[in-house]
Amino acid sequence: MKSYFILNCLNQQKIADSLYRYYIELTAHKKIKNFWNNLDREEIKNYFSIQNLELKKWFDQMELRVRDMSFTIYNEEIQTNIHTDAPPVIAKINFPVLNTQDTYNVWYDSAGKEIDRVECIKPIVLRSDIPHTVEIGSRAKFPRIQFSFCFYKDPINLLM
């Protein structure tokens, strides 16, 4: 099974802009302290109730129904380490929103040796059940914002 699969998204910028607006709304009155930030059911419902939402249309085209939604923040104060996501999720979709150029998803084998990497400039299906992290290049800007989506049916078929 592949570590990732780059997805074609004709409306990537429009979707990224919509996610960024929602991120601003979600974080307007709270300080973010963690890399990983889960949205609750009400927040997910509110986002997907937006009229003519391009992200919903895109997921509908792939026959994917969102179960969980979160965002990640990477900046001077908030980073992440090599980790494996909690079961039962094997595959999820990461969607780049802001400052993802020169940032990379990197995967490792059980011995800690790098086995794969991809720059985070396009939406990807990523394998989250093996050790992985985010690495930042010297030209990266902060804050780096990316949204992550889990589904009722994992898009594992795209990693085969």
Please provide the spans of the model-predicted regions:
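Short linear sequence elements within intrinsically disordered, low-complexity coil regions
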Residues: C9-L10, A28, Q79, K113, ...
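Residues that cap or initiate secondary-structure elements
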Residues: N11-Q13, E77-I78, P88, Q101, ...
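Catalytic core of non-heme Fe(II) oxygenases with the double-stranded beta-helix
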Residues: L64-I130
